[in-house]
Regions:
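Glycine-centered, small-residue-biased loops immediately flanking beta-strands
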Residues: 64
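Gly/charged, well-structured mid-domain segments that form the phosphate/adenylate-handling core
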Residues: 86-87, 140-173
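Short glycine/threonine-rich catalytic loop with a Thr-x-Gly-x-Asp
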Residues: 103-106, 124-135, 158-164
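A generic alpha-to-beta junction signature in SAM-dependent methyltransferases
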Residues: 60-61, 158
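Flexible beta-alpha connector loops of hexameric P-loop NTPases
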Residues: 38-47
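Extended acidic/charged loop-beta regions that coordinate divalent cations
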Residues: 2-38, 76-119, 160-170
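Substrate-engagement module of ASCE P-loop NTPases
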Residues: 52-60
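Residue-level signal for inorganic ion chemistry
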Residues: 33, 49, 67, 96, ...
């Protein structure tokens, strides 16, 4: 999966480790959300699977960044000049605090070494999107997106059609 734009120098790609095709990429910035053993029919062992992710981290361009979930046991092997950050829901270099969930809405304060942003509202109020949002906001900040643009983007993001859609939202349902 990828997102291309005629007016942006950035491309967003959901990389796939299935057949090691992510080894063909040379990202400037990357997020690794999980390394749960998968595709062992291809990799053979959990160790080989993790080694494939370690190799992927060597492909990040100097001057870029790796944002890796803090619970991942992977030891990245980045090139000189690549910054490595951690993230998670409530811990890490990038994380959420003051999480408020209720009435079909989620708000939180985004904590970042690049500058905090208060009162983030999720457009798709599903708890896992707190963590996903933290990683997305980290990439956005590193790309020069303003705090106001980040807040608006998080609030208006609607996700994939037909996933977690509200059909009715009132006090009775």
């Amino acid at each position: 999966n990828l997102l291309l734009s005629q007016s942006s120098p950035y491309t967003v790609i959901e990389a796939d480790e299935f057949d090691r095709s992510f080894h063909w990429l040379s990202p400037y910035m990357s997020v690794i959300t999980a390394t749960d053993p998968d595709h062992l029919d291809i990799y053979g062992t959990e160790e080989a699977y993790l080694e494939s992710f370690r190799h992927y981290t060597t492909l990040i361009q100097p001057g870029g960044a790796l944002i890796i979930h803090k619970d991942i046991a992977l030891k990245p092997d980045v090139q000189a000049g690549v910054k490595v950050y951690s993230y998670a829901r409530t811990e890490g270099d990038f994380h959420a605090e003051n999480i408020r969930i209720g009435s079909g809405e989620i708000f939180f304060d985004y904590i970042s070494p690049l500058g905090n942003i208060d009162d983030i509202q999720l457009g798709v109020p599903i708890a896992i999107n707190i963590e996903n949002g933290v990683a997305a906001m980290a990439l956005a900040q590193m790309s020069g997106v303003t705090n106001e643009e980040i807040k608006e983007g998080m609030k208006t993001f609607r996700g994939v059609d037909r996933r977690f859609d509200f059909k009715i939202k009132n006090d009775k349902v």
